[in-house]
Amino acid sequence: MSGEDVRIDNMDLAILIKKELERKGIRKNGINGILGFQISKNEELEQIKDLNIINTNIGEIDELEKLPNLRNLKISSVNMRTMLKGEIMTPDDRYNYESKLSGIKDFSVIERLGKLEILQIDNEKNLKRIDTENLKNLVSLKLRDNPNLKEVRGLDFNEELSELDLEHNRGRWFEIK
């Protein structure tokens, strides 16, 4: 499997991966129209250790599993409280705000990213629960300003965890298991 190309169907994720590869100075194959983004697995995808999905409408994240060495994942949507302090929102402002929401509905793929060391998720209205049991290498977990987060599971299994920040999660009932 070392020389095989891996197809990333989520174009927004493909663009983020492309930017990360460019930042690292790694040559990439490019975007092939609407068919997806072809990347050599060993030479490129395996080199991505950090990924920031910040103020970017990405939708699905199930293809994060195609990044086998991902160590640091940050996901954050724009925070409405800090975007416009006391100003009236115009239609342009609303469009700008909505384009900065991640659009992620299902975060369960994160539970299968076993090499993660740092996980940060901020301002995600669709994050309701997360299970970190399989994230054995997790050192830092920051879950902040997620209004519907109600449950964090598996912390007992995160023996390397040295930083935990569960600030401003406004779920009515919040349970740590």
Where do the protein language model's features map onto the residues?
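Small side chains
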Residues: 14, 114, 131-132, 154, ...
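Extracellular beta-strand solenoid repeats
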Residues: 52, 74, 111, 120, ...
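Short amphipathic alpha-helical segments
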Residues: 64-65, 86, 132, 154-156
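A detector of tandem-repeat and repeat-rich interaction/domain scaffolds
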Residues: 71, 103, 129, 133, ...
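Long amphipathic alpha-helical scaffold regions
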Residues: 80-91, 146, 167-174
